[in-house]
Amino acid sequence: MPGLKLNLPRIISRNFNFCFFISLLPPALLSPLYPDIAQITPWLLWLAAPAANGLITALEALMFNRYFSNRNFTIFYDVSARYKLLAVAFCAGFMSVYINISVFATWIIALIVTYIAFRYIRNFIARISKLLRPAVMATLSDIGDFANFFVNLILSCAVINLAVDSLYHHFGSTAPFNFGQGLDAIINAVYFSIITITTVGYGDIIPHTPLARIIVAAECLTGYILLGLMIGIITRGI
């Protein structure tokens, strides 16, 4: 299967938020072993742990890409693009560790993830606008891109919500979502993003602050509009 050559900005747009999400899993699984961050050696906390997490994330991203591309679920990158993917994944894994130890880093990460999600949504809207033209039918490749986009959107929203929740924990304020800690927080954030974007909203997890309500409203409207467009494009060819 021939690889696809992509420039670095497009690889960042398509993969950074996904890589950032999977990079949260190793620290979450190991967090019970280190309940007090202050007791961890500084060089281990600020350099060794982020570097190790970056390497793990890079390997995970490469394996995910190879596994799903062999089943035509996603893009298979050529050699040069895979090196860029590894670099993006390493940076995402390196940065994700700081979300638990630095307020400033958490702010920066939240802004980066939000900006990348915005660019990805904008690029996706530009693409599906072409499929809204008369007599244009969605192909299997388009449907695969829809699925990739939807998963990326869910994980991007989960990361944004987790970052906002973490900021409030740093300041000792009331958590805007109260996802919990560690692996439970990740699971709850993904669950909440799914029911928000699909506009199900069971009400077991709710936003508690004005900022959280604004974020959730934006996520809900984004999911509602884009899901409607995607379903309309797909069913038009049936």
Regions found by a protein language model. Give the residues of each.
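Transmembrane alpha-helical insertion/packing segments
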Residues: 28-120
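Physicochemical signature of membrane-embedded alpha-helices that form the seven-helix bundle of GPCRs
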Residues: 44-52, 144, 215-219
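Pore-domain transmembrane helices of cation channels
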Residues: 107-108, 120-171
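Pore domain of cation channels
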Residues: 21, 181-238
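Cytoplasmic membrane-interface regions of multi-pass membrane proteins
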Residues: 1-7, 59-75, 124-139
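Outer-pore turret/helix-boundary of cation channels
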Residues: 30-50, 148-191
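Alpha-helical transmembrane segments of polytopic integral membrane proteins
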Residues: 61, 65, 114, 118-122, ...
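Alpha-helical transmembrane segments
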Residues: 13-28
